Amino acid sequence: MLDRRNASGGKDLRLERDTGLNAGANLGPNSDADSRPEDTASGLTLEDFHYELPQDFIARRPLTPRDSSRLMVLDRAAQSIEHFTFGSLPSYLEEGDCVVLNDTKVMPCRLQATRPETGGKVELLFVRRRGACQWEALVRPGRKMKEGTLLVLHGGGSAEVVERTSASTFLFRVSEPFEEYMESWGEMPIPPYMKRHADAGDRDDYQTVYAKTPGSCAAPTAGLHFTRETFQKLEARGVEIVKVLLHVGPGTFKPLKPGPIAGQTLDPEYFEATAETCQVVNRTRGRGGRVFAVGTTTTRSLETLADLAAGAEVAFRASVAAEGGSAAAADVGGGAADSTSVGGDGAAGVAKRVAPGDGAPSLEPAKGWTEKFIYPPYDFKVVDALITNFHLPGSSVMLLTCAFAGRELILSAYEEAKRTGYRFYSYGDSMLII
């Protein structure tokens, strides 16, 4: 395994690289990570983030073991690419760095149902609890759904439409205990581009090994490559490992609109960050270590915390810790006991947090709903390195990746990935951007 510290004579790889060890492609003469003309240009449109991908590149099953997937390493300063396997990841981290994970757990939330009056088949994707006996779901087909429509769920149970909540979602009154029913009869919500039904293997494959809190309707896929051995190697190198929570919501299935990126929004998603996580991240930054974010959901959580710490106005709604739960808390089944609420009474709107002292603001624990949408140009305040997958063209997660590495570098990397046979999307290969 290549040791990145030894490869550069023990020097900080962010400042100097031994180009003689660069086994990949150099994509250009630009050595200044902050000098990316394409990121400073205004008027970017969704079409600027398009690329062609033949169906054969889409991974429909994961590799075994998890860390046998390929790892493309992008160096922003050198504008270069290297090729490894994911098992090599720990060699890129040093003592004093930290890794931040998203420990949300994917629910087996895709259920089949029948309309008793017609016998018509309906597929439901339950995305979040909205209160006692109430869940919000995407419905297919949903054109004829209306208030009072009753569905009989396969395996027992029922779901009755309470109201339409958006163009594609409905609020249902469900029979309890619904979580137990979903665990027994639900399917894992693997993406439709896999062009197959979920099976028993997806119960493990479409879940990170560290998943803890149920609430997501899609996996934080950057974490799927990690194994217990990966964490053992990281800890042996003196790397601290902490977690945030962000439940991936139905907005992950909603494409961005064609045309200008500016002015578009993401649906709110629930997140939490504990005091321990904030302390480790603050300590890492304070001593000059690097913060490695595992995935775009982790990145959005950390950057939301940075906005709050800096007193910036952000699209954020705080969770309320009230006896018996609140509408916000009930949506996700409550929050972490050691998190604090932000934004006073928890009403929808703008939240602020002013950090004490001078210099870079310190992150503080929070829980609530974030609409953080990151696209070029963007000044990252917390994240120094990003672990992510290869994403759909023009998706919000691809835009975040382009904001972090530069649009031209990412598009070049995707072409290099196709040329060298990488596997794309949720069950595909991985990318490390340093």
Protein language model features and the residues they cover:
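Surface-exposed, charge/polar-rich loops and edge strands
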Residues: L2-N6, D34-I434
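Intrinsically disordered, low-complexity proline-rich tandem-repeat tracts
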Residues: L15, A25, P29-S35
